[in-house]
Amino acid sequence: MARLFTPSESKYYLMALDAGTGSIRAVIFDLEGNQIAVGQAEWRHLAVPDVPGSMEFDLNKNWQLACECMRQALHNAGIAPEYIAAVSACSMREGIVLYNNDGTPIWACANVDARAAREVSELKELHNNTFENKVYRATGQTLALSAIPRLLWLAHHRSDIYRQASTITMISDWLAYMLSGELAVDPSNAGTTGLLDLTTRDWKPALLDMAGLRADILSPVKETGTLLGVVSSHAAELCGLKAGTPVVVGGGDVQLGCLGLGVVRPAQTAVLGGTFWQQVVNLAAPVTDPEMNVRVNPHVIPGMVQAESISFFTGLTMRWFRDAFCAEEKLIAERLGIDTYTLLEEMASRVPPGSWGVMPIFSDRMRFKTWYHAAPSFINLSIDPDKCNKATLFRALEENASIVSACNLQQIADFSNIHPTSLVFAGGGSKGKLWSQILADVSGLPVNIPVVKEATALGCAIAAGVGAGIFSSMAETGERLVRWERTHTPDPEKHELYQDSRDKWQAVYQDQLGLVDHGLTTSLWKAPGL
């Protein structure tokens, strides 16, 4: 590719738009991967009245927020728009956007929109109850968060929108479209629709035909890092970027996060610790899990896929515990000028491994085909305040998250026969030194912590640089730019202790699922259609 910019001649930067579940961010990096500035705004995805499980994505308001973030990032960086060499976008997966014939976005939903529960059940019965299996074998996805039941819901309940729809994209593609006026999807994000073939990295319209849905709404597929278009004059007025700035195809947040971590080769493994914890393992070729417990997604690196097993609400659970029970610690931490989690970790470090036998019951390991969880609770508490207190419960939560993570990695190993020798731990959870060490002790693997905490945005910026001709290879650039802050080595004795804790927790969790099955307790989360 011809170089559009010569970094040695001028100081250029790359912008990444990161559309997460809870916020939109515009992050500016220099060409060595250093974060220069960020603009951020929270957004909320509200339920539609009388539509249970819905999570609408407000296209007009959220585009305004995205533009504000881009302007804020440019202002905070103190650089002129002409020095942004290229921009790309990544987003939460599963969220979809529909457009009419004029190219106007007309409807969108966020990632865990669960309005289509009845449609999921209906689709599962198709073709002698084999339809979901056919979808999974071809795409690596089940129906729970797929676009197929959502489209069927629109056909049933909003036929006006369904009839108008002429194109479908992901939220990252919508951002790129709003900047450039060009519509396309990339495999890594579109793969989560349940409509993209893992092997060909292209749409599989036969699945829509099998579901009795229209197959004429599928937009062009372009690989991450491909030049899509340029910022239009209209978009430039709104967002502050210069008209003509290259707009590059982005991708899914997890896969681009792995690019930003240099996790770009087969068998490399990462744990991304945010609101959800994603345990991902790179696979050299498409393969799916015979038990259908694990999802499989296209990587942003062509030809490679990622087995992904998800822990539910891990980061959210920690935030709930902090906000619900640790008001005193929040005040103390504020006076000390430290993060509340840092103080809680210091307290938890004095609790012995195993947390006096306390067992948190929150997320289960991923069971993609029948995905639900037990009711949130703590089991095996003691009334001895020296043994059962906030520090004990906090450590127990960190240990349990690590146990669930290890279970998720194990079930990937069971079907892929890939046994990692180390793992990368990134995201908010990796800021905790105690948590990182516990993950090493539980998994029995060395845990590497990167310097860059904005791995997803960095991966997106790398894609922008490739599309602009600044970088020649996404994989090589990801490996070159990643830097390591520290490594945690597992303690064999603690690993053995945690193996016993893991076995006990798995047995207790199964009993807790039974209470949900009998209607005695309420699941933490249940996939649509169960």
UniProtKB/Swiss-Prot annotation:
GO terms for biological process: carbohydrate metabolic process; quorum sensing. Belongs to the FGGY kinase family. CDD domains: ASKHA_NBD_FGGY_AI-2K. It catalyses: (S)-4,5-dihydroxypentane-2,3-dione + ATP = (2S)-2-hydroxy-3,4-dioxopentyl phosphate + ADP + H(+). NCBIfam families: PRK10939.1. Its EC number is 2.7.1.189. Pfam families: FGGY_C (PF02782), FGGY_N (PF00370). It is found in: Cytoplasm. One of its GO terms (cellular component) is cytoplasm. The keyword Transferase applies. Catalyzes the phosphorylation of autoinducer-2 (AI-2) to phospho-AI-2, which subsequently inactivates the transcriptional regulator LsrR and leads to the transcription of the lsr operon. Phosphorylates the ring-open form of (S)-4,5-dihydroxypentane-2,3-dione (DPD), which is the precursor to all AI-2 signaling molecules, at the C5 position. It comes from Escherichia coli (strain SMS-3-5 / SECEC). Keywords: Cytoplasm, Kinase, Transferase. Its main location: cytoplasm. GO terms for molecular function: autoinducer-2 kinase activity. This is Autoinducer-2 kinase. It is an enzyme of class 2 (transferase).
